[in-house]
Structure formats: C-alpha cells, structure tokens
Amino acid sequence: MNNGIIVTHNGGNLETEDADVLIKYLNEKLASQYPGIVKFITGIQYRHLLIIKGGNKYVDCAPPHDHPNEEWKPLLVKPMEGVDEALLAGNCDKTPAEDVAENGGILSDEYRMSAQQTADLLNELILKSQEILESHPFNVARKERGERMAN
C-alpha cells in the first residue's frame, strides 16, 4: 500500500522465509492481544492463514488482488448482506475478551461471534497490523532500499 492505495496484493514478491519472520512478529505483537482467539499461520510467499476461534463465517472480505490501485478503506470487512439474521447473530451477549477472561484464558468451544463482531475484529487486525508491520526492521530496510513494504 502507498498513501491508502493498494499497490500490489503480494507484499512486493515476498519470499516465504521473510514472510515467516513477519507472521511470527504479528503473533507476538498482535495475536497476543487476543489470547485464545487469534492466530496467524505462515503459508507460502504472501499467502497466509488467520484463525479466529469463534469467528462468524458470514462476512464479506474483499480480495486485494481484485482491487489494485484502489483505496483500501472502502474495502474493509462487513457482515454479509442478504443472509438470514440467525446466521449473522452470535450466540452470546459477552464479547470474546469477556468469554476468554471467564474461561481461564481460552475462548469457550461454544462461543460464536456475530458477523458484526467478526468484521470488527478483522478490521481491527487489518489496521493494527499495518502499524506493526511498518515499523518492523524487515520493512524499514525494504523501504530504505526503495522496495515495497510487506503490509
């Protein structure tokens, strides 16, 4: 990204071993803020996995490769439209963090977020990850060399 515009979806042709360093950093600095709920897993090159325990699958995520040279903010995650309200609803009045706190540091197996809670969490992770990744030494060095940062 550059000035709020998606430049490329592949993190500047990121290599898997470099991505692994960044994924571990995201787990340390970001996933650790959501214990028992969020985990990043290294995949291949720029393709990785995010696990959200108790997340709701009825959200719309815009694939960045479908939106080059577009602003990213209008593409933030939203609950799906036209889906039965029962599918969008969670099964608990508590927030995920409250459930984790009440269950000894892990999310209860029965807990399911609403689609809105899941979208909000994903958007929070997107925003925070940009800040975290921008200051990582790997990206600072890439920027100094005139290369695209992986963000």
Protein language model features and the residues they cover:
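…; additionally, a secondary subgroup of soluble metalloenzymes is captured
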Residues: 1-151
